[in-house]
């Protein structure tokens, strides 16, 4: 049965014609579509989708319970995408800059982020800056690209 709900990502399209088919397993065509579908997944409480669309090498480090709690305890107020860009001549890497707004028991909040994404084997993945990647600069990249970490995802992680 088709949903008549408007997609939470802010596109104005119906959920089934927008992020819903990504939630059902169709790969997102680009990083912006993946980011929008991840926002929608937070709104809808789809923690399994959030985990599955995070870089596989980081998935074990995610706090599923905290993700579920944040999703359930927030009233999601909107998403604004500022830009989506491919940098460094590497089309399998992309940045999406966005602002997400929500309300919880502590009031209204907004979070602006420039998120990094990587494509591997036809699927885009979010590179979570809060979950470390255990790789030396000369090790194979955890995204499974076949490149060394220093020439691949290392350049897309925040420097601390």
UniProtKB/Swiss-Prot annotation:
Q: Which domain of life is it from?
A: Bacteria
Concerning InterPro entries, the annotation shows:
NTF2-like_dom_sf, SEC_C_motif, UPF0225, YchJ-like_M
* Protein family (similarity comment): Belongs to the UPF0225 family.
Q: What is this protein called?
A: UPF0225 protein PP_1119
Pfam families, sorted: SEC-C, YchJ_M-like
Q: Which organism is it from?
A: Pseudomonas putida (strain ATCC 47054 / DSM 6125 / CFBP 8728 / NCIMB 11950 / KT2440)
